[in-house]
Amino acid sequence: MTYCLRIADIPTNERPRERLMTHGPKVLATAELIAILLGTGQGPGKLSAVGLGQYLLQELGKNQRDPLAVLREVTPAELMQIPGIGPAKATSILAAVELGKRTFQFRPLDKTPIDSPVAAVAALSQDLMWQNQERFAVLLLDVKNRLLGTQVITIGTATETLASPREIFREIIRQGATRTIVAHNHPSGNVEPSPEDIELTRQLLAGAQLLGIPLLDHLILGNGNHQSLREVTTLWNDYPQGD
């Protein structure tokens, strides 16, 4: 796709809106999604809407930054410093970013069955997904895996959080939960487990066996992504939970 062409000059089946309607939003490049929000182009060299979307990403990505990470926290004034982005375009972008955040912040009602990592992530997103500091939280469940509540145990720094098995199980027992899922976030968005994450999970699984409170999973969340340690490790084979 040529970024200096007007959208009207692009073949119909290659235009962002038409491609989204035909194939769904996942096939669109980020610049094309932004183009739909912008509606029109301009900026340096009279760019098309797609070209302006690409230019915006390049500007946000200066100094080797992740442009989408910057976009999540950008202000209207910062957006409007980019040539071609005025108040109307800036507010459209920011409204879309905020709407995306809110969809991840939906929390299931209490007593909702938590039967998959996706369901657990939905319950934890408000507390963990978009936070700038690492947080450690627990999902409190009853014997039928129904949600009793969530609880943030600790809040750390941008790169680490401190949570001990003692603190975690104390809160689980205090709240009267009979099963649990633990989770923490990585503000970087990289949801691969660290060696420390693996070791803490090992300790928690051993403690859960001793206390008779099955630990169903340990999730890592960050910037719209998640990882289930139960799915990517063999720890639950080493420490069966009787679930």
UniProtKB/Swiss-Prot annotation:
UniProt xrefs under InterPro entries: Hlx-hairpin-Hlx_DNA-bd_motif, MPN, RadC_JAB, UPF0758, UPF0758_CS, UPF0758_N
Keyword Zinc: yes
Binding site for Zn(2+): H184, H186, D197
Annotated MPN domain residues: 113-235
Superkingdom classification of source: Bacteria
GO-annotated biological processes: DNA repair; proteolysis
Annotated signal peptide: none
Molecular function per GO: DNA binding; metal ion binding; metallopeptidase activity
UniProt keywords, alphabetically: Hydrolase, Metal-binding, Metalloprotease, Protease, Zinc
Cysteines engaged in disulfide bonds, as pairs: none
Residue interval(s) of motif JAMM motif: 184-197
Family per record: Belongs to the UPF0758 family.
Protein name listed in UniProt: UPF0758 protein Ava_0172
